[in-house]
Amino acid sequence: MRKILVIVVTYNGMKWIDRCLGSVYASGMPADVIVIDNGSSDGTPEYVGKHFPEAVLISTGENHGFGKANNIGFSYALEKGYDYVYLLNQDAWIFPDTFSRLVDAMEKNPDYGVISPVQMAASMERPDPRFAVKCLDRPLAEYVAGNVYEAPFVMAAHWMISRRCLETVGGFSPAFRHYGEDDNW
């Protein structure tokens, strides 16, 4: 069984965190979770500590931004020997088979460093507009469920990263506080 670490960076994410973390723990494939809280003032870290005590919680005390906070999680993943890291935005969630499908795709394609599911809008009726513009080069209906497609860019809201890739590329540049880290990576 491959070891997966899910990194969730939070900042005042109370309205989303229950669904986000709940979806991870309802996954059909076990994963550990580290929550890096960027100085929330809405009770997010306290809620995580009380309702998701199995998650590792690191409170930075201030907003370091997406990249720097994820780098804390990257270091933890490498130190603890995880095979895969999954970046999950605080306002996002996964389906029960997300990890098993992505790990299967990574195992069948060991040259892949990063893989992502199609990122849907909250309505689940269409892809997230930012994902569609940057990642899809044809109408969604032309993609076959279960297949893997190369994309020029994938937003880091849902990234599964292999350990090998993380060791090769390293973390995000601290020059990017919020947005652009994934494009630069």
Segments and roles (model prediction):
Residues P117, A132-P152:
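Short, flexible, basic/aromatic active-site loop/helix in glycosyltransferases
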Residues F95-P129:
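Conserved donor NDP-sugar-binding/catalytic core segment of glycosyltransferases
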Residues F153, W159-I161, C165-G170, A175-W185:
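A short, conserved alpha-helix in the catalytic core of glycosyltransferases
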Residues K3-L5, D32, N184:
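Cell-envelope/extracellular polymer assembly enzymes that use nucleotide-activated donors
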Residues S23, D37-E46, E62:
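A conserved acidic beta->alpha catalytic loop
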Residues G22-A31:
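Short, acidic, metal-binding catalytic loop of nucleotide-sugar glycosyltransferases
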Residues Y82-W93:
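Short beta-strand-to-loop acidic/aromatic patch adjacent to the donor-nucleotide binding site
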Residues T60-K80:
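Glycine-rich, basic loop-to-helix element that forms the pyrophosphate-binding segment
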